[in-house]
């Protein structure tokens, strides 16, 4: 009876022990694997990399202006726009900021802007023709 059980047991287990051919495939494309795996492997390696280069500067030297700087710039733009819109009526204007002094006048149909840099003292004059003929001095 023991022999019968042993034979039956061997017959039941033997199909489970049949081995197939083992094949090995490289995963890494550097060693002959599928090149489509390259992006996946690179992303996996970068996700595991916790090293941060201390000399790496992420902002590319760009300084982000503060909310107060943005507000100041917006107010200056609005005032300068108001001065430019009043020039057609013959009203001259002047805007003084920390950096510049801007004088605006309508001289015989020409828009004249005198921009003075307060730090260096340099003056630039911009003249644009084609305005109405209302002459007004500073």
Swiss-Prot record:
Record-linked InterPro entries: T8SS_CsgF
Molecular function terms, GO-annotated: identical protein binding
One GO location term (cellular component): curli secretion complex
Pfam families given in the database record: CsgF (PF10614)
Annotated localization: Cell outer membrane
Keywords: Cell outer membrane, Membrane, Signal
Tagged with keyword Transit peptide: no
Keyword hit for Ubl conjugation: no
Signal peptide: 1-19
Taxonomy, superkingdom: Bacteria
GO biological processes: curli assembly; protein secretion by the type VIII secretion system
Cited function: May be involved in the biogenesis of curli organelles.
NCBIfam families to which the protein is assigned, alphabetical: PRK10050.1
Name of this chain's protein: Curli production assembly/transport component CsgF
Lineage start: Bacteria, Pseudomonadati, Pseudomonadota, Gammaproteobacteria, Enterobacterales
Gene: csgF
């Amino acid at each position: 009876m023991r022999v019968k059980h042993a034979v039956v047991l061997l017959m039941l287990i033997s199909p489970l022990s049949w081995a197939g051919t083992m094949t090995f495939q490289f995963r890494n494309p550097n060693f002959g694997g599928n090149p489509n795996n390259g992006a996946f492997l690179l992303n996996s390696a970068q996700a595991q990399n916790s090293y941060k280069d201390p000399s790496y500067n992420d902002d590319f030297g760009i300084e982000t202006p503060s909310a107060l700087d943005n507000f100041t710039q917006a107010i200056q733009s609005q005032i300068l726009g108001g001065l430019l819109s009043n020039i057609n009526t013959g009203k001259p204007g002047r805007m003084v900021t920390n950096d510049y002094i801007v004088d605006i006048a309508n001289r015989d149909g020409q828009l004249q802007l005198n921009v003075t840099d307060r730090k260096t003292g340099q003056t630039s004059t911009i003249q644009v023709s084609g305005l109405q003929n209302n002459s007004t001095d500073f």
